């Protein structure tokens, strides 16, 4: 139904109403007059409903109070007096999204669900949490989620522990986080942005209970809130609920002052010099970062923000970006990247050089200014501007956000203006702004943007971070000395008090919630779950030795193609070069395009073209696999001829003969690995672990730590290996694109099905036959066993696992429920709550692979012991019918995530390659829904036997790995 402007509904007055064509939604901006709460409702027929409540939460120090509070309000509330209602919701709701996020100036609490009853339950738990948390009566919440003194006996060393404390230790292990921290302090010295809202590990222990409570009292009130609703719902009923249950209990006071002030511009560019940690023996040459940050305009100016986003993309993203090219060709750095951060009161335009030298800073700045000045004089390439505008429009209209609900992303994006008292609808109405930006191509609009915001603007900071050997170890020593001095200053009584507090915290963490408390969390019934597996309609046909898989869908005139070319029989010694070729494809000149022209054409005519390699194991056997080179592409069907022209140029016309160009690409990939290695820690640990016992995983691991090592070795002797490497890449190019054995999976509208297929087959007809397609794979040897991979980080990623098929066990749907139980009960309690890690996961695959892994974990051997103790815990596990139902619902929720067109196509293709049929999926779903305690307990010996081989891999701090080196077969520094 439609709501009328200026009319009141359950205390809400409609201030603005409009239909937003771009997202096909009726939009209503409202105000709750009694409490002062703001509300935006986007009404449409999307059953994936979204609710969010956000608060403006500007930090006033580095203690991370906003972040810790975000964790803590979800640890029990007035109605839901459990230790962690949030976790109970994760365990047992049908949510399609459930999380909370701390930003530099706001905190958001969003939920989403397709089930109306479940959606109401989620909304109520979250509202009760933010307005009535138990933090005022339970000081142990701050100790658990924020920080506490960790000491269990008088002779123990004193240390800090806490979930957020350890999370932020992990965050600040990366150079990127340190760059951002230094930049924000310098860019906004007089505003809340100068503080780290997530918390700095050095400052988190300064947060007191009083300051913690004061922050909640100050900012968590309806008049400082932004409520967002999206989707198909009874809006009048929802408004009445919000008013009656929550908002009517809070009278607007006018006392909340959370406005984000503007930072005055500087008279001149500010300079910051700092260091970041690398290993004690790690080389430091070419590892300096330089980053120029420029404050640009006002977040509420949607057109300018969109234009600056396009300009950043034009200047700095892709192989045709002129500023990026100028910097790379000057040799100032090995990799150049840019970003536009529009979710600040004053957005930030950034240009980063990675893999540089300290003395290159002035040259970095000089080239930026010279290049920008030349662009304002000579003009930006109009085709380049058009290409990036086309790509932006494609992404906006496609609105494919992967597993994230569309309504969630809209809710986050409206905050870019709404949070600063701007129009929340402005960013959703992009058509007019896009048209104005297209008109700007005909004028000097973009050149004037460069002049006004990038050249003449003095609100800038240049940050330089140099690598410092052994910095992490020295900081740990300083912290240990500080803690020793602190403990020495404590009298016996104070030490005893801290031991008692630590002991009491552990008791509370280990204690189970009462049945009465658990039953306050609303729960669906098993009967609410759809028993039948959701089946994607597909049409499979064979053309000779090739398979064609069509997935019908409404795609808004977009064609999606996933092309899997068979490489199974490839020489195993060539596998590292296969992954390298996947990285360099499209980045060399071709017989028709320069690599810059190719990048422009791709942006102009497609929604993206990507290349990757992967080994797909059969559903029930990790050692029966095929290797596929995959091309993923999408384009408007009107541009299909352009898409295949691009693919033909890459497949048949790539000139892989330029050693200098290969060196440039290698430098970029190497530098990216260096800067992101620690953030990839869990993936590195888990893929390396799986490679110890799975031949398919050994192939895929060639794209992880083995690839990192391969790149380093190749770069170290590039002059001696360049020609051989180029020759191997040319050889592989003739094998990658082949017509002997492939799977073409594609999706488009039925009316365009034959058009898409005809053009695809015309392209395939040009491709050569292959000598490796359809052959038996050459098995790789395991790269090692039980490795400790040492980084300059402060925390660990601890993985252990094995192959349960080896011991005669078969996959069962109960394993997927056990994943949920372990992630959010056993491992959550042992690894996160008691151990202080940010998180932990569990995985059981049909192919026999099983692993457990922790994330940003301050512990090492304790986490391994938790894995080894798991079977004994599981043998004694007796869940009530309600608890079983809860975990079943939570598991099904993960399986029933709504799929976008591209996700549905990929799923169909992978199921085909892995030989997963509907009957297998239905059997698993039935086993999940019909789960019993006995099914779970049967898995205890499976875990015990599989872990008995003691396969493990740890990525983390050198100190922790050195202290536990006896458990490793091999340790090494990155």
What positions do the PLM features span?
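Acidic/histidine-enriched segments that form metal/cofactor-coordinating
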Residues: 2-7, 76-78, 85-214, 306-309, ...
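Short, Gly/Pro- and small/polar-rich lid/capping loops
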Residues: 2-29, 529-539
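A structural supersecondary motif
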Residues: 94-96, 291-296, 316-355, 413, ...
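A generic structural motif
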Residues: 57-59, 113-117, 231-235, 296-300, ...
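N-terminal cofactor/phosphate-binding cores enriched in small/glycine residues
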Residues: 28-115
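His/Glu-based metal-binding/catalytic segments typifying zinc-dependent metallopeptidases
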Residues: 40-45, 52-54, 165, 169-173, ...
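C-terminal regions of mature proteins
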Residues: 2-3, 231, 388-544, 548-552, ...
């Amino acid at each position: 139904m439609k709501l009328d402007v200026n009319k009141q509904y359950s205390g809400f007055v409609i201030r603005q109403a409009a239909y937003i064509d771009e997202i096909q939604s009726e939009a209503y901006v409202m105000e709750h007059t009694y409490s002062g709460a703001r509300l935006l409702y986007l009404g449409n027929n999307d059953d994936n409903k979204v609710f969010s409540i956000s608060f403006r939460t500007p930090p006033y120090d580095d203690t991370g109070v906003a972040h810790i509070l975000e964790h803590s309000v979800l640890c029990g509330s007035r109605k839901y007096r459990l230790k962690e209602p949030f976790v109970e919701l994760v365990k047992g709701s049908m949510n399609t999204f459930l999380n909370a996020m701390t930003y530099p100036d706001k905190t958001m609490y969003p939920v989403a669900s397709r089930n109306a009853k479940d959606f109401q339950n989620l909304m109520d738990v979250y509202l009760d949490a933010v307005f009535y948390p138990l933090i005022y009566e339970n000081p142990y919440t701050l100790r658990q989620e924020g920080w506490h003194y960790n000491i269990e006996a008088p002779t123990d060393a004193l240390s800090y522990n806490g979930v957020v404390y350890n999370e932020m230790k992990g965050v600040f292990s990366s150079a990127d986080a340190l760059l951002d921290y230094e930049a924000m302090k310098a860019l906004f010295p007089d505003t809340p942005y100068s503080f780290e809202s997530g918390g700095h590990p050095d400052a988190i222990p300064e947060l007191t209970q009083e300051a913690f409570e004061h922050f909640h009292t100050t900012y968590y009130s309806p008049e400082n809130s932004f409520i967002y609703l999206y989707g198909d719902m009874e809006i009048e009923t929802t408004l009445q609920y919000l008013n009656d249950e929550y908002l009517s209990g809070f009278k607007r006071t006018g006392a909340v002052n959370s406005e984000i002030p503007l930072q005055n511009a500087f008279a001149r560019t500010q300079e910051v010099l700092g260091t970041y940690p690398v290993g004690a023996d790690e080389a430091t040459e070419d590892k300096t970062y330089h980053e120029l940050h420029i404050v640009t305009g006002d977040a509420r100016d949607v057109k300018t923000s969109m234009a600056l986003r396009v300009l950043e993309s034009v200047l700095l993203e892709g192989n045709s970006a002129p500023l990026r090219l100028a910097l790379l060709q000057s040799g100032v750095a090995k990799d150049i990247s840019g970003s536009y951060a529009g979710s600040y009161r004053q957005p930030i335009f950034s240009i980063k050089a990675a893999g540089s030298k300290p003395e290159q800073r002035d040259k970095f700045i000089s080239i930026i200014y010279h290049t920008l000045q030349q662009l304002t004089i000579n003009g930006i390439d109009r085709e380049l501007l058009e290409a990036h505008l086309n790509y932006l429009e494609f992404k906006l209209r496609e609105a494919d956000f992967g597993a994230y609900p569309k309504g969630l992303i809209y809710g986050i994006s409206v905050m870019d203006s709404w949070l600063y008292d701007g129009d929340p609808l402005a960013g959703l109405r992009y058509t007019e702004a896009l048209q104005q930006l297209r008109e700007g191509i005909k004028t000097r609009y973009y050149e004037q943007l460069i002049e006004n915001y990038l050249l003449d603007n003095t609100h800038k900071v240049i940050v330089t971070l140099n690598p410092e050997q052994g910095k992490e170890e020295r900081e740990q020593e300083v912290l240990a000395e500080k803690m020793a001095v602190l403990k020495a200053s404590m009298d016996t009584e104070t030490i005893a008090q801290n031991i008692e507090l630590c002991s009491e915290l552990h008791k509370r963490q280990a204690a189970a919630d009462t049945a009465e408390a658990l039953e306050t969390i609303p729960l669906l019934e098993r009967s609410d779950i759809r028993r039948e597996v959701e089946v994607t309609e597909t049409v499979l046909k064979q053309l000779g030795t090739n398979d064609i898989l069509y997935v019908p869908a409404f795609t808004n005139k977009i064609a999606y193609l996933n092309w899997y070319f068979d490489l199974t029989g490839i020489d195993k010694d060539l596998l590292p070069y296969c992954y390298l070729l996947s990285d360099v494809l499209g980045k060399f000149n071709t017989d028709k395009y320069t690599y810059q022209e190719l990048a422009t054409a791709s942006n102009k005519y497609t929604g993206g073209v990507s290349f990757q390699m992967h080994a797909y194991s059969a559903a029930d056997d990790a050692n029966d696999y095929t290797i596929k080179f995959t091309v993923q592409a999408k384009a408007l069907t009107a541009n299909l001829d352009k898409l295949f022209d691009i693919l033909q140029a890459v497949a048949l016309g790539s000139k892989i003969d330029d050693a200098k160009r290969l060196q440039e690409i290698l430098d970029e990939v190497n530098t990216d690995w260096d800067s992101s290695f620690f953030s990839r820690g869990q993936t590195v640990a888990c893929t390396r672990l799986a490679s110890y016992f799975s031949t398919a995983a050994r192939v895929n691991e060639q794209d992880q730590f083995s690839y990192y090592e391969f790149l380093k070795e190749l770069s170290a002797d590039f002059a001696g290996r360049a020609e051989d490497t180029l020759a191997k890449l040319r050889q592989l190019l003739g094998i990658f694109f082949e017509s002997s054995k492939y799977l073409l999976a594609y999706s488009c509208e039925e009316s365009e099905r034959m058009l898409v297929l005809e053009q695809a087959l015309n392209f395939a007809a040009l491709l050569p036959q292959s000598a490796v397609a359809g052959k038996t794979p050459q098995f790789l040897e395991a790269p090692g066993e039980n490795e400790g991979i040492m980084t300059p980080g402060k925390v660990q990623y601890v993985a252990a696992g094995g192959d349960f098929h080896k011991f005669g066990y078969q996959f069962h749907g109960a394993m997927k429920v056990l994943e949920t139980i372990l992630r959010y009960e056993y491992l959550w309690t042992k690894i996160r709550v008691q151990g202080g890690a940010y998180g932990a996961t569990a995985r059981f695959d049909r192919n026999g692979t099983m692993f457990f892994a922790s994330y940003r974990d301050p512990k090492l051997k304790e986490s391994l012991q938790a894995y080894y103790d798991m079977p004994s815990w599981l043998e004694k596990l007796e869940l009530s019918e309600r608890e079983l139902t809860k975990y079943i619902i939570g598991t099904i929720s993960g399986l029933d995530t709504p799929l976008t067109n591209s996700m549905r196509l990929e799923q169909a293709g992978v199921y085909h390659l892995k030989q997963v049929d509907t009957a297998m999926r239905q059997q698993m779903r039935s086993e999940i829904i019909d789960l019993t305690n006995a099914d779970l307990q049967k898995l205890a010996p499976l875990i015990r036997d599989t872990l008995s081989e003691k396969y493990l891999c740890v990525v983390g701090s050198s100190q922790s790995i050195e202290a536990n080196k006896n458990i490793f077969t091999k340790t090494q520094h990155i």
